[in-house]
């Protein structure tokens, strides 16, 4: 029996805090190019729920997968790792 109730957790940087109760978090990952072998950086942006509007631009935060809060929000900020 595996524990499937573990939610995904990602670490990224807040790149936008303009929306109410929402921050945009950029997740960077390194991948090897399939043909040339060079290590390149790929990034994805996720909208995450921030109930108290406490996370600011540039903060490094951990986000966790949750039930959908809106059309584009299915992640929630868990904690701050580094304050800008």
From Swiss-Prot:
Keywords: Ribonucleoprotein, Ribosomal protein, RNA-binding, rRNA-binding. GO terms for molecular function: rRNA binding; structural constituent of ribosome. It comes from the Bacteria. Disulfide bonds: none annotated. The keyword ATP-binding does not apply. GO terms for biological process: translation. The keyword Ribonucleoprotein applies. SUPFAM superfamilies: Nucleic acid-binding proteins (SSF50249). InterPro entries: NA-bd_OB-fold (IPR012340), Ribosomal_uS17 (IPR000266), Ribosomal_uS17_bact/chlr (IPR019984). GO terms for cellular component: cytosolic small ribosomal subunit. One of the primary rRNA binding proteins, it binds specifically to the 5'-end of 16S ribosomal RNA. Part of the 30S ribosomal subunit. Belongs to the universal ribosomal protein uS17 family. This is Small ribosomal subunit protein uS17.
């Amino acid at each position: 029996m595996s524990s499937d109730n573990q939610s995904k957790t990602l670490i990224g940087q807040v790149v936008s805090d303009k929306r109410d109760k929402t921050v945009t978090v950029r997740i960077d990952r390194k991948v090897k190019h399939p043909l040339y072998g060079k290590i390149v950086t790929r990034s994805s942006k996720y909208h995450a729920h921030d109930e108290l509007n406490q996370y600011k631009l540039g903060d490094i935060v951990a986000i966790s997968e949750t039930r959908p809060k809106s059309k584009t929000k299915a992640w929630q900020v868990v904690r701050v790792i580094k304050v800008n």
